[in-house]
Amino acid sequence: MEAIVFDRFGGPEALAPRTVADVHAGPGQVRIKVAAAGVNPIDGKIRSGAMQQFIPTQLPAVPGIDVAGVVDEVGEGVADVVVGDEVLGWAESGSYAEYAVASQVVRKPAGLSWEQAAALPVAGETAQRVLDLLGVTAGETLLVNGAAGAVGSLAVQLAAAAGVTVVGTASEANHAYVRELGASAVVTYGEGLAARVREVAPQGVDAVYDTAGHGALPDAIELLGGTTDRVITIADQAAESLGVVFSGGGTVEPRPALAEQARLVAEGRLRVRVAEVLPLGQAQKAHEISDGGHARGKLVLTP
């Protein structure tokens, strides 16, 4: 099968198209003919070797976690999907390929495009997981750092829908977009963040969800009066040195939440913004954009 492969750790230039051995569904897995693959910042961090301590990767490797496509092979013990089902989920063999295997998938609603489907699994799970860990409730104020990105934009919507007052950070060009998602106020990230947040939220914030890094954790801690128990980052590896929780994955069964989010997107009640769709052969370009950190929404690759 055709796939994108990296056989060394490095920049986007480490990615190259290659013919590799076909993958097949094992027990509890399905094989998916890939219709679209989502690109996540974590893909670039794995490719660069920065995540080797946390997610050991054996080279050569096919990148990609988000996958959407049609089931064409079902492994032993799988009872909830059949060959021909349209699904989305988390690839275990790398999704930047003709075929991928996965054990965690849900059926794709008819109203959901392939591109939207591929944009949802990682971002949706991450957004909901950290909101649950923070325990934000109606009436509280949440600061979302990186509110225009794939994870941040979903976190803003999910929190606002639950009655949480959301303050988002984004570049100036994305302020209006973040307000459309449900944020009560938006400020520009960077130096002086704490002061800008206080201007728009003089009552303070109750929790901080850092999806983007950009050195925001010291400001987040300052805004919470020096405490770190309600600050969580998914992007800043300096978290441990600051006493902040770095959330890199969950232990809760993710499929029910994904199925619900997919339904909401299909019904137009939750927005998944696809920033750009590129052919699989341009995975290197997609990683260059993703590594830059300014995509408004999700990058998606299609065969």
Describe each model-derived feature in a short phrase.
Residues 211-273, 280, 303:
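Glycine-rich phosphate-binding loop and adjacent beta-alpha segment
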Residues 11-14, 19-68:
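N-terminal glycine-rich beta->alpha transition that marks the start or flank
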Residues 120, 124-191:
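Mid-domain Rossmann-like dinucleotide-binding core that forms the NAD(H)/NADP(H) cofactor-binding site
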Residues 192-203:
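Short amphipathic alpha-helix with an adjacent loop that forms part of the alpha/beta core around
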Residues 82, 110-113, 135-141:
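Short helix-loop-beta connector
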Residues 269-273, 287-303:
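C-terminal capping/lid region of NAD(P)-dependent oxidoreductase domains
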Residues 68-91:
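A glycine-/small-residue-rich N-terminal strand-loop-strand element
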